[in-house]
Structure formats: structure tokens, C-alpha cells
Amino acid sequence: MYGESLVKLMLALDVMDEKKAILIAKETSEYVDSIKIGYPLVLATGLNIIDKIKESTNKEVICDFKVADIPSTNEKIAELTLNHADGIICQGFVGSDSVSAILNVARAKNKKVIVVTEMSHPGATEYLQNVAEDMAKMADRLKVDGIVAPSTRPERLKEIKSIAKDAFVISPGVGAQGGNLSDVLNVLNENDYVIIGRAIYENENPKNAAKKYKIQM
Ligand code: O7E
């Protein structure tokens, strides 16, 4: 039914209205493997939106709070978030003690931790890019479940993925940010996810847009 590479599709559901979020999540769920919810939707509607999206789609929901604090605060954020979500995204630049605090909470709840390395926007080349390989090494050493690396720079995606070799990759940048899907699919495999937001939820027919991407994967 779908393409050869079988890379997974993660919908970035950054709308700010509960009804719209649930409608788009339901409409696209046939073509989506996982749903990423972040500050826009949670701040607009509350953490319970995670349970509502899970109930209405039966999909895994990953919470994207890019947590970046000292260990004890990270632990509190992870505890509250992982009472709802299947996984949590945190920043790697805060260091291994802060990431480990989240990992400890997640392991106790059998949930996933995904660490950001290099981000996809142009500004990521100013600071983050310089330490992205080191963060990928830390992710490998700590045995986190997944890492985030950019679809806007496929050569960097490849390099970072080769360092954190046991982690799955979730990669944003295809669609609105200009990343090229086929370049990215050359790097990713069946454990990895392409993250797409606006190119699906801002389309006048989100279901068709999700289908269009999924059949290429
Ligand atoms: O550009 P879009 O609309 O397809 O959405 C991309 C999503 O990925 C959006 O939620 C944004 O916040 C997120 N993202 C990036 O775009 N770049 C990054 O480097 C990292 C993320 C991200 O989600 O980090 C955690 C996966």
C-alpha cells in the first residue's frame, strides 16, 4: 500500500483549538504513525488534550516541551507530562545530568525520551550545530530512545544519525521549512520518523495531504 522505505510519519499538531486538533488528528490517523503535541496546543487547551487525542486516534502521542532545566525541575516536568504522553522531548544542551533526570522518570513509567541535537531552523547553525555531535554521543551513551535531527540539512542528519546509532530519529523540516522528502528518506530507515506539521494541518484537506506524504514513504 505504501512506499518501499516504510519510514514513519509523525504529525506535528501545532494548532491552537481543541476541536480542530481532534478533527485533524482523527481525519489523518489512517496515514499517521505518531502525533507530536507541543506548547501551542497544550497551552491553548491544557494537558488533558493529550488523553483526548490518544482516545480519539489510538495513536502514540509524544509531548514536545523541549525540556531544558536543572535535573530536579526536569524531573517534575517529566513526571507531570508522562502521566499523559507516551514520550517526552528534551534538549540535550543542558547536559547529561538533566537528561538523566528525565530518563529516570521515563524508565519507571515505561515511556520514551527523545533528545534534541541540531535543530532545523537557520539559527541552529549559530550555536547548536557546534555541539550537535557531542549531544548525539551523549544520547548514545545514555541510551535514550530517540534523537531529533534536521530534515533541512540531510548531510547533517546522516552524520548525527551515524553517531547515535541505536536511537531512532525523528526529523522535522519537510514541507513548510523546505526540506526535501526524498533526500531525507535516503538517510532514514523503518525505525525513524519524518515530522510534518503545517504542510498537513494548514492544507485545506489535511487527510489528503497526510496521504500524499505517507504514500511516498
Ligand atoms: O515546520 P512544520 O510545520 O512541519 O513543523 C515542524 C515541527 O517540528 C514543529 O512542531 C516544530 O516545533 C518542530 N521542530 C522543528 O521544526 N525543528 C526542530 O529542530 C525541532 C522541532 C521539534 O519538534 O523538536 C522536537 C521534535
From Swiss-Prot:
It catalyses: orotidine 5'-phosphate + H(+) = UMP + CO2. One of its GO terms (cellular component) is cytosol. Substrate binds at residues 14, 36, 64-73, 120, 172-182, 197-198. Signal peptide: none annotated. GO terms for biological process: 'de novo' pyrimidine nucleobase biosynthetic process; 'de novo' UMP biosynthetic process. SMART domains: OMPdecase. The active site is at 66 (proton donor). Its EC number is 4.1.1.23. Keywords: Decarboxylase, Lyase, Pyrimidine biosynthesis. GO terms for molecular function: orotidine-5'-phosphate decarboxylase activity. Homodimer. This is Orotidine 5'-phosphate decarboxylase. It comes from Methanococcus maripaludis (strain DSM 14266 / JCM 13030 / NBRC 101832 / S2 / LL). The gene is pyrF.
